[in-house]
């Protein structure tokens, strides 16, 4: 099985780093996925030096996986502002930091979560 890389777009993605960077790293995340949080907290910091010197650009794309524990992340993603990558990336980091709290919520809590995180529904 091969993957068609030509179908990857930067639509609905957060870009961290220069568009002119020669290396683009496309990362698929879910705001409620513990592996995504682990990567962001423990692996991604090693890329900061390369982002700062213009070698690497991170392209974060949401992975909408139909799995009960991830449903809140799926819905919250719909309200992220992809036109302001820096501000939205700060929010993504906050959502990862609060992931355990988010996990206690279900879809009925989305309006309250949106209010708490200043998301417009």
Predicted regions and their residues:
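N-proximal helix/coil linker or "cap" segments that precede and/or mark the start of modular domains
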Residues: 1-4
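A short beta-strand-turn-helix
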Residues: 6-23
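Mixed-charge, polar/low-complexity N-terminal
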Residues: 7-8, 32, 38
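Short active-site neighborhood of thiol/selenol oxidoreductases, capturing the structured segment around
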Residues: 19-34
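Structural alpha/beta surface segment adjacent to cysteine/selenocysteine redox centers
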Residues: 29, 37-115
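Thiol-/selenol-based redox modules, centered on thioredoxin-like
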Residues: 118-121
């Amino acid at each position: 099985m091969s993957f068609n890389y030509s179908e990857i777009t930067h639509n609905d993605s957060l870009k961290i780093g220069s568009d002119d960077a020669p290396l683009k790293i496309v990362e698929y995340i879910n705001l409620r996925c513990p592996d995504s949080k682990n990567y962001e907290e423990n692996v991604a910091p090693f890329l900061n030096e390369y982002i700062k010197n213009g070698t690497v650009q991170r392209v974060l794309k949401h992975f909408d996986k139909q799995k009960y524990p991830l449903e809140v992340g799926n819905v919250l993603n719909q309200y992220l502002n992809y036109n302001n990558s820096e501000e939205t990336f700060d929010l993504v980091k906050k959502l990862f930091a609060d992931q355990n709290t988010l996990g206690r919520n279900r879809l009925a809590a989305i309006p309250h979560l949106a209010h708490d995180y200043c998301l417009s529904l």
